[in-house]
Design a protein with these regions (language model features):
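Feature responds to low-complexity, polar/acidic, surface-exposed segments characteristic
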Residues: 2-32, 39-61, 67-94, 98-120, ...
Length: 184
């Protein structure tokens, strides 16, 4: 997983004290990971009630932004889709078909930026972005989940599992829940 060095700062009588708690794993699908991605501007802000925000799911445009950054994909591709012109993530979306990542969402002509994305589609996008971009490639694959066999992205899920990039979907460590949407 991506790690973030957490260093909380406290102030007493005008004196700042910083303590380091070490590197903390930040999965893209964990609450901490999603908060990190949101703070980095890679997710749309949620301005609704807290319960509505908790029920919000990751969109294709947000996934494009995340995988573009994670994979180190260039943001200078020409305009690829006509339905993303109003998206703040248009530059990230434009790179998707030039690196073959559009196969993960099965949408060759329209990107549909506000559609939600499933865990297996996101796994596919991550692997393809890392393979195509400037990030160090992932190696190996392990079949640690018992429920992803029907997904057409089983190989990509297994690569992410071998590299500890994406966690199980629940406290049952052998479940990936490939069709489940990623809630933010």
């Amino acid at each position: 997983p991506v790690t973030v060095n957490t260093s909380p700062t406290t102030s007493t009588n005008g004196t700042s004290v910083t303590s380091t708690t070490g590197d903390v794993a930040q999965y893209a699908t964990s609450t901490a990971g999603l908060n990190y991605l949101s703070g980095a501007g890679l997710l749309n802000n949620c301005t609704e009630t807290s319960s509505a925000c908790q029920a919000k799911t990751m969109t294709r445009e947000e996934a494009a932004a995340v995988v573009t950054v994670i994979g180190g994909i260039s943001l200078d591709a020409p305009n690829a889709y006509s339905d993303d012109d109003q998206s703040i993530f248009q530059k990230a979306i434009n790179g998707i078909p030039y690196y073959g990542i559009q196969v993960c969402i099965g949408s060759p002509f329209q990107f549909q930026p506000t559609e939600t994305i499933s865990r297996d589609q996101f796994a596919c996008m991550l692997v393809k972005a890392i393979t195509a971009g400037s990030t160090t490639n992932l190696s190996g694959a392990i079949d640690k989940y018992s429920d992803e066999g029907a997904s057409k992205w089983t190989n990509e899920i297994n690569v992410l599992a071998a590299n500890d990039v994406i966690p199980a979907c629940s406290s049952l460590q052998d479940k990936f829940c490939p069709s489940r949407k990623i809630s933010i």
